[in-house]
């Protein structure tokens, strides 16, 4: 079952603090939010579980210890896994220099703890000089967080959208460019050119990036490496591990083990306090 993601009545754009943060827990069901935008820039940090953000030209996957940065004014929607714990950080547009486009950031332990500490501050505490100093340290650290390629380029082109939706639902059935060319009644060459034009990647690269995102979604939920490999249509677990390591630099087991080495601080304050 899927429920709507909400911010407990909190409306970040009505506040003019340089930065404000709070955390939420998804509960036992997946959560989703419709397309929306904020005046403020938004950083979504995954503590447990994962979140997938959809913007006009890409899908952004956010596993634990990572965050997605969404500049102010960018329309987006979110899908959160069951039992996920997330921290939202809203930043005034002129408060700190951040990327002008969406990106996934690998968040350092220091930066993570600064965000969680800010999330635990009450309304009264947020007005104190100590909080302003904390925010300044956070602003010194945030621009230095390395960007990661945990996104799938897409576009508004109906063929590209159809391919994403159908490959996500049936990755085993839709693995070859020739299948898609037949489905769209066009030549493989023309379809390959369209994919490069719309995404900047070849079909093989684009499909592999989708597989990486789907693999992370499955692994974060607790699926075994063998199950994920089978779901994605790999004949052997070894072949899947090779693809995963090539894309993310580590085997699936080591990657997930690293994501779970840090236990998140319990931080679920009511942002209206």
From Swiss-Prot:
Q: Name one GO biological process term.
A: regulation of DNA-templated transcription
State whether keyword Transcription applies: yes
The protein's UniProt keywords, in alphabetical order, are:
DNA-binding, Repressor, Transcription, Transcription regulation
Q: What region holds the HTH araC/xylS-type domain? A: 158-258
Up-regulation conditions: Negatively autoregulated.
Pfam families for the chain: AraC_binding (PF02311), HTH_18 (PF12833)
Record InterPro entries = AraC-bd, Homeodomain-like_sf, HTH_AraC, HTH_AraC-typ_CS, RmlC-like_jellyroll, RmlC_Cupin_sf
Which GO MF term does the entry hold, naming one?
DNA binding
Physiological role: Negatively regulates expression of the nimT operon and its own expression. Acts by binding to the nimR-nimT intergenic region.
Task: Write down what this protein is called.
Answer: HTH-type transcriptional regulator NimR
Give the species this sequence originates from: Escherichia coli (strain K12)
Source taxonomy: Bacteria, Pseudomonadati, Pseudomonadota, Gammaproteobacteria, Enterobacterales
């Amino acid at each position: 079952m899927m429920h709507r993601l909400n911010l407990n009545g909190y409306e970040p754009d009505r506040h003019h603090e340089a930065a404000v943060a709070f955390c939420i827990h998804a509960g036992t069901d997946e959560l989703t939010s419709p397309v929306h935008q904020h005046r403020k820039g938004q950083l979504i940090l995954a503590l447990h579980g994962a979140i997938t953000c959809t913007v006009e030209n890409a899908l952004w996957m956010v596993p634990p210890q990572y965050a997605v940065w969404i500049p102010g004014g960018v329309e987006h929607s979110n899908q959160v896994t069951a039992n996920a714990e997330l921290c939202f950080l809203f930043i005034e547009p002129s408060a700190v220099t951040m990327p002008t486009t969406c990106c996934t950031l690998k968040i350092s332990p220091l930066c993570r703890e600064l965000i969680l500490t800010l999330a635990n501050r009450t309304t009264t505490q947020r007005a104190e000089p100590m909080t302003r100093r904390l925010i300044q340290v956070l602003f010194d650290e945030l621009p230095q967080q390395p960007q990661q390629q945990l996104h799938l380029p897409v576009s508004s082109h109906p063929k590209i959208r159809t391919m994403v939706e159908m490959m996500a639902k049936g990755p085993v059935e839709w693995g070859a460019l020739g299948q898609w060319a037949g489905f769209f009644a066009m030549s493989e060459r023309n379809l390959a050119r369209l994919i490069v034009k719309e995404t900047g990647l070849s079909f093989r690269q684009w499909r592999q990036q989708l597989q990486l995102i789907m693999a992370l979604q499955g692994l974060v939920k607790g699926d075994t490496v063998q199950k994920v490999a089978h779901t994605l249509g790999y004949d052997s677990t070894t072949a899947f591990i090779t693809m995963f390591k090539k894309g993310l630099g580590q085997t699936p087991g080591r990657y997930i083990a690293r994501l779970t080495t840090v236990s998140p601080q319990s931080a679920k304050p009511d942002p209206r306090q």
